[in-house]
Design a protein with these regions (language model features):
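Beta-barrel outer-membrane channel/assembly domains of diderm bacteria
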Residues: 1-145, 173-177, 181-199, 203-204, ...
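A short secondary-structure junction signal
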Residues: 25, 157-160, 204, 213-217
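Short, flexible helix-coil linker/hinge segments at the edges of structured domains or between repeats
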Residues: 160-174
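Surface-exposed extracellular loop regions of Gram-negative outer-membrane beta-barrel proteins
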Residues: 100-103, 150-164, 350-358
Length: 421
């Protein structure tokens, strides 16, 4: 105890180094004779408008030029966990990273390359920020309350309905198959859960812009709040769990690492009703039988105004602009994840997952796409692991490429070194 950081506070650390690169292929070309158009991404002819790629150019070449280099970013997290009674928790997380310039941050040219560990403060690279600040405490028998100015949706769930992955690679496989429902919204919020036996019921609210007093830009329960309200009913045991959840989102939805550009636009411009069904089973001890996790999500966009940036997805071609209202449309997602513990050597884990990132399933768009990843986590010491991984995206732009019959894909590989202390 003489060497403790504090009599009430424990320090936990996480650092991840990611070294790797991505390649791109396919015959997709940007729409000819159209200058860069920031408000939209595809024309009425279905061809992609590159938003920076030269008109008529091959998009795979543009992607390689802007996101094809070897890169070596990092993510650092320091958790200060304080307990005053032995049953409560005040968590303060300090976080820094420099992923914004990498292909793994969830930005163009391929948002679905986003990684779970890809972080950078809005203030810039290598800047330390307060990423979490919340207080959690029991109330009576079976109830737990959580509130704070920097709390995430999953911090307030009694159970997370997935055992996959033992080590994260692509972000899309870390949302229990339903990123619309489990959006991991982060901001000001509060929640309550109840547990009895194997059953649990959780309810929470998060406003991503809850620090603002301007109702048009933020606040609690306002138009600008970028808010989510979630209810989850779950049942689980020592090695299994299943859950059904509902989330209402208003101005807070997907980012590029969660779905196709069209699906992401639907969330950005509409209020959304989302449901998710997720389950997992893990053997009590390592065996030939894998841990299996599965999940499915369905989202319905609630229609509204057709003003640009509100409910519409903008398209354009030379001398012409149009809007597509996604109000009333729907999108879906699903995944299956498998992993085997103590594979080849004790402490090592191998796993893979596949599925469809969020894609629009109505309005006649051919927005479907597939993602796959495989990895092998080598536990070098109790505190250090090294994970080589590869991954593939079949049609990361969805309808933007498929409606014109053109192809575009991405393949990548990396080595992730993780330190826990």
């Amino acid at each position: 105890e003489a060497n403790q950081f504090s009599t009430t506070t424990k320090l936990k650390g996480y650092a991840a180094f990611v070294f790797g690169a991505n390649t791109f292929g396919g015959n997709l070309r940007t729409t000819p004779n159209v200058s860069a158009y920031s408000g939209g991404v595809f024309g009425p002819d279905g061809q992609y408008i590159g938003g920076g790629a030269a008109p008529g150019s091959k998009y795979a070449s543009y992607a390689s030029q802007t996101a094809g280099a070897l890169s070596f970013p990092y993510d650092l997290r320091l958790d200060l966990d304080t307990s005053f009674t032995g049953k409560d928790l005040l968590r303060t997380r300090l976080r820094a990273g420099n992923f914004n310039g990498s292909a793994w941050f969830g930005n163009a040219p391929v948002g679905l390359l986003g990684m779970e560990t890809a972080f950078e403060s809005g203030a810039g690279n290598n800047v330390v920020e307060i990423n979490r600040l919340f207080y959690q405490f029991p109330i009576g028998s079976g109830f737990t309350a959580t509130f704070g100015p920097r709390v995430r949706q999953d911090d307030m769930l009694a159970m997370w309905p997935s055992a996959y992955p033992a080590d994260t690679v692509l972000d899309i496989f870390t949302y229990a198959g339903a990123p619309g429902t489990y959006s991991l919204n982060l901001g000001a919020g509060g929640g309550l859960w109840w547990k009895a036996g194997g059953f649990s019921l959780s309810a929470n609210y998060v406003s991503a812009n809850g620090d603002s007093s301007n109702p048009s830009e933020g606040g609690i329960g306002t138009e600008g709040a970028a808010q989510t309200g979630t209810v989850q009913l779950a049942y689980g045991g020592a090695n299994y769990g299943l859950a059904a959840a509902y989330t209402y989102s208003s101005g807070a939805g997907l980012y590029g690492g969660n779905g196709t550009p069209l699906a992401v636009a639907g969330f950005g411009g509409n209020s959304t009703n989302s449901v998710g069904l997720s389950a997992y089973f893990s053997p009590l001890s390592a065996s030939w039988f894998p841990s299996i996790s599965a999940g499915w999500g369905l989202n319905t966009y609630v229609g509204g105004s057709t003003t640009a940036g509100a409910t519409s997805y903008t398209t354009a071609t030379s001398g012409y602009a149009d809007t597509i209202n996604l109000g009333g449309d729907s999108s879906q997602s699903w995944y299956l994840g498998f992993q085997w513990g103590d594979f080849l050597l004790k402490g090592n884990t191998v796993g893979f997952a596949f599925g469809q990132p969020t894609f629009v399933t109505s309005s006649g768009f051919n927005d479907g796409n597939y993602a796959w990843e495989g990895w092998y986590k080598m536990q070098v010491t109790d505190n250090i692991s090294v994970t080589p991984a590869i991954y593939y995206l079949s049609a990361p732009l969805g309808a933007l490429q498929k409606d014109s019959g053109q192809s575009f894909n991405s393949f990548g590989g990396l080595i992730k070194t993780t330190f826990r202390f």
